[in-house]
């Protein structure tokens, strides 16, 4: 009887088509092959389609993410203090304003060390990089400057394409496929500054478990994965939000409504953004203490999650209150201006 080598392209594809999860070795082999440009475009299309049809596992994600993170541009002088990243997988189609970007600056204004890892929009929605650039923040900055900003100001922004040069070859094919793939899930997992805590939003409830397992597999101390009411990849004011809380290798599930934390329940329509100009105006007003109440409340809700994962607050209600107090000042905007000016020099 002939025993097939399990680490070959045909065997891996057959396994995926049979709805079997890949082993750690197969996952790493596949990612390394992509990074080394050893997979033909037609094979890549088949693998990406098969992974999506099967449904990705948390172990597959963590194995691939570790390889991708190791291949990123990693500064030699990584900060010694613990960092937090806040982002979503995107793909919710809700066209909200840039909630997680606002959360990053409010959290940093409250003393959390934030390494925000982001990109331009791939779907017509305004991405974090788009809105920050429009407000004057330079994107193409040296890795040393990015880390220096973090040490000096407690917040920095990593423009993803500058830190993952090995993925350049895959970009045209991913775009031509026209559907979301495993790379949309890997992006939020591979911050090159290796934060020990993270708040991560998912647009589909069936991603809650694999993404929380992936974060655990990558060794994070604390994390929150959230699927917002109404399908947001952020905690929402629209109703019951589904959570996975990771703490000391234990993952627990919880459902939290806005009213549980003293917040207004209102539809996601109230959180709509629009074009780049509109989203930039919303973000600037919000950080300046001038945003509307619903914008403040949804940012406060998500900031409370950051305060929890960072160990700053153990109680979400207290975190919401601290965030709302901050959002009634211009502290977050002043911090943005400091980061913008520092990165521009």
Curated annotation (Swiss-Prot):
What cofactors does the UniProt entry give for this protein? Answer: Mg(2+)
Single GO molecular function? anthranilate phosphoribosyltransferase activity
User: Which leading EC class covers this enzyme?
Assistant: transferase
Binding of 5-phospho-alpha-D-ribose 1-diphosphate occurs at: 88, 91-92, 96, 98-101, 116-124, 128
Is rRNA-binding among the key words of this record?
Answer: no
Q: GO CC annotations?
A: cytosol
Tell me which EC number(s) this protein carries. 2.4.2.18
Give the signal sequence positions.
none
Q: Any idea which positions bind anthranilate 1? A: 88, 119
Where, in this chain's numbering, is anthranilate 2 bound? 174
List positions binding Mg(2+) 2: 233-234
For biological process, the GO terms are: L-tryptophan biosynthetic process
Q: In which pathway does it act?
A: Amino-acid biosynthesis; L-tryptophan biosynthesis; L-tryptophan from chorismate: step 2/5
Q: Detail which positions bind Mg(2+) 1.
A: 100, 234
Q: Which reaction does it catalyse?
A: N-(5-phospho-beta-D-ribosyl)anthranilate + diphosphate = 5-phospho-alpha-D-ribose 1-diphosphate + anthranilate
Q: What does the record's cofactor remark say about binding?
A: Binds 2 magnesium ions per monomer.
Q: Does the keyword Glycosyltransferase apply?
A: yes
Which keywords fit this entry according to its UniProt record?
Amino-acid biosynthesis, Aromatic amino acid biosynthesis, Glycosyltransferase, Magnesium, Metal-binding, Transferase, Tryptophan biosynthesis
Subunit structure, per the record?
A: Homodimer.
What task does this protein carry out? Answer: Catalyzes the transfer of the phosphoribosyl group of 5-phosphorylribose-1-pyrophosphate (PRPP) to anthranilate to yield N-(5'-phosphoribosyl)-anthranilate (PRA).
Family assignment? Answer: Belongs to the anthranilate phosphoribosyltransferase family.
Q: What is this protein called?
A: Anthranilate phosphoribosyltransferase
Whichever gene encodes this chain, its name is: trpD
């Amino acid at each position: 009887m002939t025993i097939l080598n399990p680490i070959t392209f045909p065997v891996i594809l057959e396994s995926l088509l049979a709805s079997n999860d890949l082993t750690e070795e197969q996952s790493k082999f596949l990612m390394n092959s992509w990074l080394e440009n050893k997979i033909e475009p037609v094979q890549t299309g088949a693998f990406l389609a098969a992974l999506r049809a099967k449904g990705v596992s948390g172990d597959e994600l963590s194995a691939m993410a570790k390889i991708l993170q190791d291949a990123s541009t990693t500064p030699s002088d990584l900060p010694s203090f613990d960092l937090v990243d806040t982002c979503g997988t995107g793909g919710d189609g809700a066209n909200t304003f840039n909630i997680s970007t606002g959360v990053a600056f409010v959290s940093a204004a409250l003393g959390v060390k934030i390494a925000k890892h982001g990109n331009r929009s791939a779907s017509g929605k305004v991405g974090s990089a788009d809105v920050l650039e429009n407000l004057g923040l330079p994107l193409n900055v040296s890795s040393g400057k990015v880390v220096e900003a973090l040490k000096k100001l407690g917040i920095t922004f990593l423009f993803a394409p500058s830190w993952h040069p090995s993925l350049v070859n895959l970009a045209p094919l991913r775009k031509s496929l026209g559907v979301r793939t495993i790379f949309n899930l890997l992006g939020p997992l591979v911050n090159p500054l290796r934060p020990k805590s993270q708040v991560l939003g998912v647009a589909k409830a069936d991603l809650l478990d694999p993404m929380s397992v992936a974060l655990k597999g990558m060794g994070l101390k604390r994390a929150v994965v959230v699927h917002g009411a109404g399908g947001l990849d952020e905690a929402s004011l629209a109703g019951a939000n589904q959570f996975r809380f990771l703490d000391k290798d234990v993952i627990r599930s919880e459902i939290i409504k806005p009213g549980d934390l003293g917040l207004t329940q209102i539809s996601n329509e109230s959180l709509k953004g629009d074009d780049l100009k509109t989203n930039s105006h919303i973000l600037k007003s919000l950080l300046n203490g001038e945003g509307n109440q619903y914008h403040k409340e949804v940012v406060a809700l998500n900031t409370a999650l950051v305060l929890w994962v960072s160990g700053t607050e153990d109680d979400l209600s207290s975190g919401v209150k601290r965030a709302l107090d901050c959002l009634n000042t211009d502290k977050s905007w002043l911090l943005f201006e400091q980061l913008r000016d520092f990165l521009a020099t």
